[in-house]
From Swiss-Prot:
GO terms for biological process: ribosomal small subunit assembly; translation. GO terms for cellular component: cytosol. NCBIfam families: PRK00092.1-2. Keywords: Cytoplasm, Ribosome biogenesis. This is Ribosome maturation factor RimP. Its main location: cytoplasm. SUPFAM superfamilies: YhbC-like, C-terminal domain (SSF74942), YhbC-like, N-terminal domain (SSF75420). Belongs to the RimP family. The keyword Cytoplasm applies. Pfam families: DUF150_C (PF17384), RimP_N (PF02576). It is found in: Cytoplasm.
């Protein structure tokens, strides 16, 4: 995480804690000519539009006082959606037995992408069962080789 995002997280985390919400992720992304600060929040049962608006309002007030981002941007607050990113240890633990999409920094056994059921996670290794054509394969992926991981929707 960049230094700017760490500073933003230091501003946002107390707000989400106060509102009893989970801070899932923060992203600062450019789309076309515009920059977007995206804050993803959640709670058991999901968040509603009023909770997103409350976080947006409080974050906007705090950022106006001392904004670590120097350029203009749009602030967006939303739920992470069905394909929630897996970033924290707890995210991976909660995803055991769920369908996930994982990419790695470098090939592992000839693959850089897996989509299947997360069978287990021990803090260092993800064990995923995938279907390759007609057979099931169990793959072990070291956590430190994971570039991105998220929940996935199985079709």
């Amino acid at each position: 995480m960049s230094k700017v995002l760490e500073q933003v997280e230091a501003i946002v985390a107390p707000i989400t804690d106060e509102l009893q919400l989970e801070l899932v992720d923060i992203a600062f992304e450019k789309e076309g000519p515009n920059w977007f600060l995206r804050i993803f929040i959640d709670k058991d049962g999901g968040v509603d539009i009023d909770e997103c608006a409350a976080v947006s309002e409080k974050v906007s007030e705090k950022m106006d006082e001392n904004d670590p981002i120097t350029q203009n941007y749009f602030l967006e607050v939303s739920s992470p959606g069905a394909e929630r990113p897996l970033k924290k240890e707890q995210d991976f633990e909660n995803a055991v037995s769920k369908y996930v999409h994982v990419t790695s920094y470098e090939p592992i056994d000839g693959r850089k992408m897996w989509e299947g059921t997360l069978v287990s996670y021990d803090g260092t290794t993800l064990v995923i069962t995938i279907t390759d054509k007609t057979r099931k394969i169990t793959c072990e992926i070291p956590k430190d080789k994971v570039a991105k991981a998220r929940l996935a929707i199985q079709f």
